């Protein structure tokens, strides 16, 4: 791996960018907790308050682990966000359960989630990089 300052800066910036959505969603959830709970009620999850709190924790803690990569454990944050992102497909974007045009809209969201997972996998691979 290249051992340059530019590479390190790019790596740090990429960690922020790959987690940006999760930071924004987690911070929004902290300040709009009732709305997050209602989303969990809408999709029929049991214990919506617990799931809402878990969602926010996962988004913020996973992002922090990736960005700060303490002792090389950023891969745990990547894993947290990968599992979270994949679970949102059947729980929140079950495109197969809808008719058109909503089916296509939800399918596109699911594809975007798969793309995010690819970025998170790369962040897990780079978690072991040391300057």
Each PLM stretch: what is its role?
Residues 1-32, 49-61, 68-131:
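Extended, low-polarity transmembrane helix blocks
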Residues 31-46:
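Membrane-interface interhelical connector segments
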């Amino acid at each position: 791996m290249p051992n340059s300052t530019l590479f390190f800066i790019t790596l740090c910036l990429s960690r922020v960018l790959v987690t940006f959505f999760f930071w924004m969603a987690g911070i929004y959830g902290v300040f709009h907790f009732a709305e997050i709970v209602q989303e969990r009620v809408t999709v029929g999850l049991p214990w919506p308050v617990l799931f809402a709190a878990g969602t926010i924790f996962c988004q913020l803690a996973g992002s922090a682990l990736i960005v700060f990569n303490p002792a090389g454990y950023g891969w745990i944050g990547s894993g947290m966000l990968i599992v979270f992102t994949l679970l949102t497909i059947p729980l929140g974007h079950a495109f197969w359960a809808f008719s058109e045009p909503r089916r296509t809209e939800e399918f596109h969201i699911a594809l975007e989630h798969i793309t995010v997972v690819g970025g998170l996998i790369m962040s897990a691979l780079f978690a072991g990089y040391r300057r």
